[in-house]
Design a protein with these regions (language model features):
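Polar low-complexity intrinsically disordered regions enriched in Ser/Thr and small residues
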Residues: 6-8, 54, 117-118, 136
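Catalytic cores and adjacent binding grooves of peptidoglycan-active enzymes
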Residues: 60-139
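Extended, low-complexity, intrinsically disordered C-terminal regulatory tails
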Residues: 24-53, 106, 114-118
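Charged, low-complexity, helix-prone segments enriched in Lys/Glu/Asp/Gln
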Residues: 9-15, 43-48, 93-94
Length: 139
């Protein structure tokens, strides 16, 4: 059974408690790592300037302003062999998203997934840019 390492736990602790609840339910079923929780101004600016985010500071759900808990998390499927993260394994990200979204629904938590921004379950319409590891809380 999979569990989070220290680095993933530290990042997950920066996320809203509802996001944490979903992630803790999914990790024993589908091994994954936490890439980002909350991002400070410098981290968000760098992510935006390098094209890893479409939102400048403080517009991202990763930005907890005032300082608090992030309304977003970025995760990726984790493999025990290298490379541990396989960014081109689209099907694995989609499968992980299914676990995340179903678990959130069972817990009564509303999430939006970066592979289905408009939440219509059609991945091939207007869902650009794809951000398959991104999940954000709908408050």
């Amino acid at each position: 059974m999979a569990s989070y390492g220290k680095a993933s736990l530290a990042k997950l602790e920066t996320c809203h408690k509802e996001i944490q609840a979903v992630c803790f339910e999914v990790i024993p079923v589908f091994d994954h790592t936490i890439i980002w929780g909350a991002r400070g101004e410098a981290e968000q600016t760098r992510a935006f300037e390098e094209g890893f985010s479409t939102k400048p500071w403080p517009e991202s759900k990763h930005n907890a302003v005032p300082p608090g808990l992030s309304d977003a998390v970025d995760i990726a499927p984790w493999h025990t062999t290298k490379p541990h993260i396989r960014w081109d394994a689209t099907n694995e990200f989609i499968y992980l998203a299914g676990h995340m979204m179903q678990t959130a629904a069972m817990l009564g938590i509303q999430l939006r997934w970066g592979g289905d921004w408009d939440r219509d379950h059609d991945l091939y319409d207007i869902n650009k840019p794809f951000d398959l590891g991104h999940f954000e809380r709908i408050a």
